[in-house]
């Protein structure tokens, strides 16, 4: 594939396609991944980053499955912090791998919900509050992998390079 500029993409999902193009070309170029095309909606740009992060994090969770299980990680911890899973009627303790799956399923469902995100061309202001909770929970999955499965995390990051751009995006936003 040849590289194309944002202006060349003629699609209602141009931001998604452009972000995927940037990631495909050079995931390590964090500055370029974070640079929103001129004249675009910042909320939609953040939304597309979260959507792409959820897709990419599925690869991390699959990579963790062999080492992170109910026996090795009976609770969702990052260092010594214990996190409860919000996927249940009442937040409760889950093993780390279940927490990761629940978190990704919940984030993906929420980001694809027509109730909260009826359009990918603009984000309704009442839905912006979900960005922070999604980001916080996804960060916990990264943190668990970093503190408890460093080798798998490092392997994932070397091939997919998602954590560092995402942290830069969150601290830049």
Task: Give the ranges of each region predicted by the language model.
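Extended alpha-helical interaction segments
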Residues: 1-122
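Alpha-helical bundle/repeat cores within regulatory domains of eukaryotic proteins
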Residues: 112-173
